[in-house]
Each structure stands twice: as C-alpha cells, then as structure tokens.
A protein has these predicted regions:
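Residue-level detector of conserved catalytic or cofactor/ligand-binding positions
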Residues: 1
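ABC-type nucleotide-binding domain
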Residues: 4-259
Length: 259
C-alpha cells in the first residue's frame, strides 16, 4: 500500500516493544502521540532508547510488537519508499559529499530551486557563513567537507534535511555542534517551520528540549513522563526535573551509549 500525503494528524505508537537480534531489549511498551504543528523532544540519559524509538518511524528498525501509526495508518502496511518520502531524518553523524555547498544541500531534493536552497540554509543558520565563502554556494568543500568546521558541517546537514520539505522532520541532536547564538537562531526558525510539520527532536541539550511543545522523558526504554517543559519542571520530585537538576550540576550520566 502506498502512503498518502499530506499528513493531517500525526504519529502514534501503541505498546511498542523492541529488542536487537542479540537479545538486548531496548523499548518496553512505549506509547505516545505527536501532532502536526508540534515539536516533540525525546529526552533522557544515554541508553534510554531515544534513537531506537526515532528509527522505528521511517522503518530503519521494526518493532518486536506493537504498532507505529501515521494518521491512523499502520506503517508496516505501506511501502517503505512511500513512507520515507514523507520523512526527512537528520542523523547524529554528519556526512557530506566532495562537491560544492549547493551540491550538498541539493542532495536533499534534486529539483529544489535556488530560493528553496537559500531558505533552507537560512533556517539552518548556514546562509551567513556560506555567503562568506570564496565562491559562496559554489565553493568546493573538499573531501567529506574537510574545509568546514564541525558546526558548519552540521548546519549544512540541517539545510539538506530542511530542503526536502517533508511533513515529518526527525532531528537527532540538531544543535550539538552549534554555538549558543546559532542554536538560538535555529530554534527560533524551527518554530516557524513546525507550524505545518511534525517535528521530532532527540535532544541532549536542555536548551533544545526547552523549546519543544512536548517532552517525552525516557529512561530504560520506557516513557516515564510527558508534558510541556513548564509542566514537567513544575514537579520538583519528577523524573525530568531531577534530570535537569543533575545536568545543571554537571552530571552526564553513566548509562551505556544510546541504542
């Protein structure tokens, strides 16, 4: 079955369980809903299952049991190609090709206009540094973007994801290599972008999580709390509030790397 767009409602998971082939169990009965026009942040310590949960939506992984629904349609019953045409996914590790700045952004959507490219770069906070490059958008980036800083690479990868103009946008730590000013700019622009999209963010920075409409706080493969940043912070004994308090005191967590 082909997936039909546009997406009008959102994503829902129902009692999702997931385990890797080696038997490692990662998700345990996860249920949540995220709506179009809303930014939802997956937050929690390393090993909580945030990335695994995000990977289920474009079917990079399949749940052991439970369902993932988009607008009420079980994604297991639609073609993978038609599903992924609805989703732009920004991975944690930035990968660039050896071409120009324009080549790297256009890779997200080959028929994108120059206006589309510039708009995506502006939202990603990349337009300013691109304009300062020797040939602007036609500047060659060298092998795997070797001429750019880590933060600049991440902004180009963000622009590539944004130029796809898909109804679902999934961002894995999108601000991890951005300085505070660039992060603030990106989060401000993301609010505008999210008006007509469903945005999921895997957030490690508290400032990124604070910009979300909804936080899903995960630990040990379960959602312990959900709500707006203000709601969760208003509970002194809550799991998210404790996590924030520990983070602000410099604790980084001792759990294994996130699956």
């Amino acid at each position: 079955m082909l997936f039909r767009s546009p997406i009008r409602e959102g994503i829902q998971t129902e009692d999702v369980h997931f385990a890797y082939t080696d038997g490692t169990s990662v998700l345990h009965g996860v249920s949540f809903a995220a709506r179009v026009g809303q930014v939802t942040a997956f937050v929690g310590p390393a090993g909580a299952g945030k990335t695994t949960l995000a990977y289920l939506i474009p079917r990079f992984l399949r749940p052991r049991s439970g369902r993932v629904l988009i607008d009420g349609a079980d994604i297991a019953r639609v073609t993978r190609q038609s599903l992924r045409a609805q989703i732009a996914f920004l991975f944690q590790e930035t990968v660039l090709c050896d071409g120009t700045v324009e080549d790297n952004i256009r890779f997200g959507r080959l028929d994108a206009s120059e206006t589309d490219l510039c708009r995506a770069a502006e939202v990603a906070g990349a337009n300013e540094f691109i304009r300062k490059l020797p040939q602007g958008y036609q500047t060659s980036l060298g092998r795997a973007g070797s001429k750019l800083s880590v933060g600049q690479k991440q902004r180009l990868a963000l622009a590539r994801a944004l130029v796809r103009d898909t109804p679902i946008l999934i961002l894995d730590e999108p601000t991890s290599a951005l300085d505070p000013e660039a992060e603030k700019h990106f989060l401000t622009m993301l609010r505008e972008v999210s008006r007509t999209r469903l945005v999921l963010i895997i957030a490690h920075r508290l400032s990124t999580a604070a910009a979300a409409d909804q936080i899903l706080f995960l630990k040990n493969g379960q959602i312990l709390e959900r709500g707006s940043p203000g709601e969760l912070l208003s509970h002194p004994g809550g799991a998210y509030r404790r996590y924030v308090d520990l983070q602000t005191r410099g604790w980084t967590g001792s759990e294994p790397t996130d699956n």
